[in-house]
Amino acid sequence: MLATPATADDDTGGHDARGLTATVKADAEALLPQGAPGVLVDVRTPGRSLKVRAGYGNLTDKTPVPWNARFRIGSLTKPFVAATVLQLVGEGHLSLDTTVEEVLPGVVRGNGNDGSRITVRQLLQHTSGLPEYLQEMPHLFTLDGFEEHRFDTVTPQQAVRLAMRHEPDFAPGTSWNYSNTNYMLAGMIIESVSGRTWQEEVRRRIVRPLGLTQTVLPGTRVGIPRPHAIGYERFAGPGATAEDPKYTEAIDATRQNPSWGGPAGDIISTTRDTQRFLRALIGGKLLRPAELAEMQRTVPTNGGFLSNWPGARYGLGLMWIPNSCGGSWSHGGDIMGYMTRNGISADGRRSVMVSINTDTLQRQPGVPAPVGDVTTELIDHALCPA
């Protein structure tokens, strides 16, 4: 399998730079037997920028992931949306304590769901208790269903109505549970408050000011602008268990209508642009100090999040993950064909972005399962110099 370090943009040229490149290269290669078709890693540190890639962006042609590949960032969309909401808060258009009912009257109602008891803060923090709309879209997670519905359009309004078929997971503010419904509503709130679509507001407030020229908010468009790796997807087969999903053969899932993710997960970007965004966000270039402090005020997570990232806490569209040198801010993303992982140090001086062209990893026989998330060691090595 191919594993190549980039040679450009290394300003130090010393032993430390070569050592970091070798370490990150080895970490990227280690993801291949875990089931990654291809890996692209981008590390930014003071005076240094390095990229490493491993495996293939196209398994048929045996070509590598392009250095400047665009990819679907999945739930890394959420910090873009949260930052946009927080800018509106800072401008006085609403507050974090504004209820959903005040902005979107009658939208969150039924089966015990009550928008008058849920605040904007609770949406962004996943403490609303709102059920997950994706449980009403099981076709996304089967081979036949995905092939039949991959080009369907799903609006945020439709997604929220699907969620309202279920009772809340808990009373607002009493617990934590990751639910994409929260961010569908956040996008709707942006539109109600601003009078523009959530995509227009994200472009106007974040994409254009930061010069994120490689970032696309696709809406219902099914393709990814070139260059890009093929996104591979596997689906659980008959008799699947958590330990053995009995995956089908991988299919090309690159072309799909991402509207089912909407403001919860449909953005397309690159390692350069996503790092520029996170560094600007943590560096205080997008939010006023008060709103950034609110974004970084965290609550404990639970369930699978703690299994993947022990000690993880969640703020307003940002996750804090402990590591060997303290911790980092992060938000991963998984969407059909693509997995994104990242981290940025608390001072914003070191950051790393990892793109894998599948979100369904199938380990090779005899390869042990990772402890926690599959990219944990790589991200730790990138952010925590030895």
Regions found by a protein language model. Give the residues of each.
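Short active-site loop at a secondary-structure junction
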Residues: G35-P37, D61-Q122, F170-S179, G262
